[in-house]
């Protein structure tokens, strides 16, 4: 029989949506049985009390249960006493039935909710399993390795020219197809095991849920034991024992009053039992639902987390392997162009095939051992070259594979890949193996060549030793590698990668890979991908250094590159091919340090920034208090006036006091020696049209206008229609950014001749403030993608539409509400002191806005209004007010606490928009327009 439904008033919208969901029939029946067995009333009370009452003849079902004392006349017969006592006995007897009925309704409600919860989980489970199976099907149908390789082919092709490109085009499809077959086996294996895990998920989850519900409600017993109930029953038995019914000294009226008081106590006891048990059952029900959801999440974690991690890592491993294969071909393209391919391609293929095979076997071995796909490290990829290196020598691709016949793969397997076979595709590019295009190429004398096919690296080493290959990229010296640690610095792909990096870093961006350099991100896709996949070396000091003052290009020119370039065989025979030199060598003679540095350090230039992570210099270091302008990086690092703790001092900012003060002085201050470099200089006036220069701040030594407010890290990006997109970090931000960090979206003069002195409306200051709004260190750890609330790929490469930042708004509100108490502590302890210091430091004039609620003295208290006046000491005239609005996406018609004027005596024109603290009402989506959480929850600041 269907259990009784709870009333509609007790059902929320979520419950109404859930009632169509039903779990598996087995689970539904199991839940019903568990609740019926567990929620039975304990009848011990009836067994103990009722027989005792019956011995006094008090239990008469036909007697009335409503005896009122005022209905009993004085001097009535003892029959009334008996009826009154019997009504009390019936009341006790009915308590058990009442409690059972109430708990039966409670059981029905719980049964309904638990079944609906299980049904919803079953529905979600089916949906997720379907999605998982669909994802696995797509994963099998997509050739991950081919997909990953296509994105690199174009970049690598742009690096190669002539015969090098021919060699690359000949090699790339062959090795990728071969690697696809090897890698596809691992993909199918992962998909098969993941599918089995998904199919087992439902049965395992149902069993776990039933077991959990049974364990929870096994502790649920409905008891009739109650102090008031026991007290009433005992009192009734004592009345019978003392024969008060037959005692003529006790009037019927007094006796009935006593009985009615006793019945009231019994009824209160019954209600207390029902309420207590209902409360306990509700707790158990809530706990059971939480347990069911937890079991569901745990089951999904085991299946979907593994599925997601494996799919993600399969893709990463495919990218890793594809990039390595193509990179190896690129490195070898110059050395093994067509004139040498004829002699050495067989050995080259053997080496590459062993590398691919061993890499895929390593991936599968890790999966068998750990159950997870782990992307290969550079050393694991190089194992294909060096695992059987007997003579410990190293060449461009490092090491030898075992030359024995048993280790060399069957080349027929490689050539049988359809249209990519050697015989079919080579004719489309060049002549076949019998061509005489390069008749003068000497054949290297390879010892033992008649006995076995030499590997690529061995033959290339012999070729390099005999100086028959002027195009050789480089042959490392014969040395004892001394273990895997040294491989990172002197051998194999690492040394080649170092030279490749050097060439790419010293090459103009448009000659390698297209990309803008103004964005502070990678201008070169190849370098980005190489760094992404962990090709770290001992030569990567500038990317690991704690000093932000080292320039990467300086380092490359001044580091151990000389030792590496000594091994480069330059080829100057083909002047028409820009990349005719070694693929890893610069297009010109390696420039000296002094020839490289000026170009990257010229003010206003747009030097390359690399995503390579450098450790953030602590803002607490006392060494930063006296940093000079010439010690700061020119474009990579900008000011951070970030108060991430409540006791931060003035000098603890990233930049020195002198630079901050200099940034807000006007050009007419003759005593300042650096006026001509200020952001507000007449000759350095900026406009929104100068976006590229403004965002990089390369022209301005101070890197921005210092804001006399309690700043938080935020990235401001110009969008369409003059609207700026904001990017807020997830940590080290504070609530009141909406009150104090608001930039007026004011019009900017486009004239080049606007005099800063006559800038009465403050557009120059506003413009500088807008474009340098809380500048940040782009390589700061806090701005890692994982710590940013909303980020775009290649954010600096495109103008962003205002509609794209809408999700950030809700995210910020949710983050604020979740962390309000912590933020409140920061507000109470940190704002007053820090803002007072900044006001004194920069001579901030605070208008008396909403005077009735603010008692502030000039330059002594931080402006808590939404308006702050910047008064450079040299202007003398009315300073403009920066009307700092909520954000650039706010409605323009919102009433402000103060308008754009410098009259400090002007009162609020719209008192309704002023809170008791003088601040503008904080508009939260979904809240009343006059709701301000600060007034309600936070100390006024």
From Swiss-Prot:
- Spell out the Basic residues composition-biased ranges: 606-626
* Domain of life assignment: Viruses
Q: Which cysteines are joined by disulfide bonds?
A: none
Species the sequence originates in: Human herpesvirus 6A (strain Uganda-1102) (HHV-6 variant A)
List all Polar residues biased stretches: 567-584
Whichever gene encodes this chain, its name is U90/U89
Compositional bias (Basic and acidic residues) at which positions? 14-23
Q: Extract the ranges annotated as region (Disordered).
A: 1-23, 567-632
Q: What is this protein called?
A: Immediate-early protein 1
Q: Which Pfam families match?
A: HHV6-IE
């Amino acid at each position: 029989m269907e259990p009784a439904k709870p009333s509609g008033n007790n059902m929320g919208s979520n419950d109404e949506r859930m009632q169509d969901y039903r779990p598996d029939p087995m689970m539904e029946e199991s839940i019903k049985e568990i609740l019926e067995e567990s929620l039975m009333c304990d009848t011990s009370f009836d067994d103990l009390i009722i027989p005792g009452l019956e011995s006094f003849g008090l239990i008469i079902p036909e007697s009335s249960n409503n005896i009122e004392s005022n209905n009993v006349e004085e001097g009535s017969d003892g029959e009334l006493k008996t009826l009154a006592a019997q009504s009390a006995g019936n009341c006790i007897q009915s308590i058990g039935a009442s409690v059972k009925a109430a708990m039966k309704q409670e059981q029905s409600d719980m049964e309904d909710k638990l079944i609906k919860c299980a049904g919803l989980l079953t529905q979600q489970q089916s949906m997720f399993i379907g999605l998982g199976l669909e994802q696995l099907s797509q994963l099998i149908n997509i050739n991950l390795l081919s997909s990953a390789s296509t994105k690199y082919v174009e970049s690598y092709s742009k690096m190669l020219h002539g015969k090098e490109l021919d060699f690359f085009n000949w090699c790339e499809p062959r090795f990728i197809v071969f690697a696809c077959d090897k890698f596809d086996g691992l993909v199918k294996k992962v998909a098969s095991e993941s599918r089995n895990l998904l199919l087992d998920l439902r049965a395992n989850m149902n069993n776990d849920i039933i077991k959990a519900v049974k364990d929870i409600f096994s502790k649920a017993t409905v008891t009739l034991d109650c102090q008031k109930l026991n007290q009433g029953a005992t009192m009734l038995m004592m009345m019978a024992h003392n024969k008060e019914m037959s005692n003529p000294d006790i009037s019927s009226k007094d006796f009935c009053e006593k009985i009615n008081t006793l019945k009231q106590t019994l009824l209160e006891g019954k209600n207390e039992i029902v309420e207590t048990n209902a409360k306990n059952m509700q707790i158990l029900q809530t706990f059971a639902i939480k347990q069911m959801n937890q079991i569901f999440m745990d089951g999904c974690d085991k299946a979907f987390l593994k599925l997601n991690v494996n799919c993600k890592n399969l893709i990463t491993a495919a990218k890793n392997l594809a990039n390595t294969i193509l990179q190896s071909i690129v490195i070898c393209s110059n050395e093994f162009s067509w004139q040498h391919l004829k002699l050495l391609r067989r050995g080259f293929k053997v080496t590459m095939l062993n590398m691919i095979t061993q890499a895929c076997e390593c991936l599968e071995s890790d999966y068998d051992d750990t159950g997870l796909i782990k992307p290969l490290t550079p050393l694991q990829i190089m194992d294909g070259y060096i695992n059987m290196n007997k003579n410990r020598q190293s060449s461009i691709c490092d090491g030898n594979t075992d030359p024995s016949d048993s280790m060399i793969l069957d080349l027929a397997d490689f050539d049988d890949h359809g249209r990519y076979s050697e015989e079919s595709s080579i004719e489309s590019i060049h002549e076949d193996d019998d061509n005489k295009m390069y008749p003068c190429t000497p054949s290297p004398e390879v010892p033992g060549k008649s006995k076995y096919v030499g590997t690529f690296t061995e033959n290339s080493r012999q070729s390099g030793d005999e100086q028959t290959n002027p195009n050789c990229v480089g042959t490392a010296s014969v040395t004892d590698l001394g273990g895997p640690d040294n491989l990172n610095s002197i051998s194999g792909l690492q040394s080649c990668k170092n030279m490749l990096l050097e060439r790419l870093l010293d090459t103009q961006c448009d000659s390698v890979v297209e990309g803008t350099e103004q964005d502070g991100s990678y201008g070169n896709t190849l370098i980005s991908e190489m760094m992404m996949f962990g090709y770290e070396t001992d030569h990567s000091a500038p990317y690991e250094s704690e000093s932000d003052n080292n320039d990467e290009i300086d380092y490359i020119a001044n580091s151990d590159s000389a030792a590496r370039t000594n091994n480069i065989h330059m080829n100057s025979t083909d002047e028409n091919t820009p990349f005719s030199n070694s693929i890893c060598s610069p297009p010109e003679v390696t420039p000296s340090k002094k020839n490289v540095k000026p170009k990257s350090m010229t003010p206003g230039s747009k030097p390359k920034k690399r995503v390579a992570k450098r450790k953030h210099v602590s803002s607490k270091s006392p060494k930063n208090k006296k940093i000079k302008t010439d010690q700061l990086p020119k474009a990579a690092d900008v000011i951070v006036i970030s108060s991430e703790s409540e006791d931060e001092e003035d000098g603890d900012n990233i930049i020195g006091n002198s630079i901050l003060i200099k940034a807000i002085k006007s050009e007419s201050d003759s005593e300042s020696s650096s006026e001509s470099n200020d952001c507000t200089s007449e000759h350095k006036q900026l406009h929104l049209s100068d976006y590229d220069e403004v965002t990089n701040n390369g022209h301005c030594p101070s890197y921005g206008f210092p804001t006399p407010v309690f700043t938080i890290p935020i990235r401001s990006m110009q969008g369409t229609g003059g609207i700026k997109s904001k990017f807020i970090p997830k940590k080290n931000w504070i609530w009141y950014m909406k009150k104090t960090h608001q930039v007026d979206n004011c019009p900017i003069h486009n004239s080049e001749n606007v005099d800063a002195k006559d800038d009465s409306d403050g557009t120059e200051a506003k413009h500088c403030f807008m474009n340098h709004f809380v500048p940040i260190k782009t390589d700061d750890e806090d701005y890692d993608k994982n710590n940013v609330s909303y980020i775009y790929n290649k954010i600096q490469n495109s103008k962003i539409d205002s509609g794209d930042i809408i999700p950030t708004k809700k995210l910020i509100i949710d983050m604020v509400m979740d962390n309000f108490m912590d933020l409140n502590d920061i507000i109470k302890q940190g704002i007053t002191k820090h803002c007072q210091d900044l006001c004194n430091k920069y001579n901030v004039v605070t208008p008396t806005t909403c005077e009735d609620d603010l008692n502030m003295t000039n330059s002594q208290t931080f402006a808590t209004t939404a308006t702050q006046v910047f008064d450079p000491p040299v202007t003398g005239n009315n300073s403009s007010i920066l009307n700092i609005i909520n954000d650039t996406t706010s409605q323009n018609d919102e009433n402000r606490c103060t308008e754009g004027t410098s009259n400090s005596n002007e009162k609020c024109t719209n008192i309704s928009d002023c809170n008791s603290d003088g601040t503008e009402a904080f508009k939260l989506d979904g809240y009343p327009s006059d709701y301000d959480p600060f007034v309600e929850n936070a100390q006024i600041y």
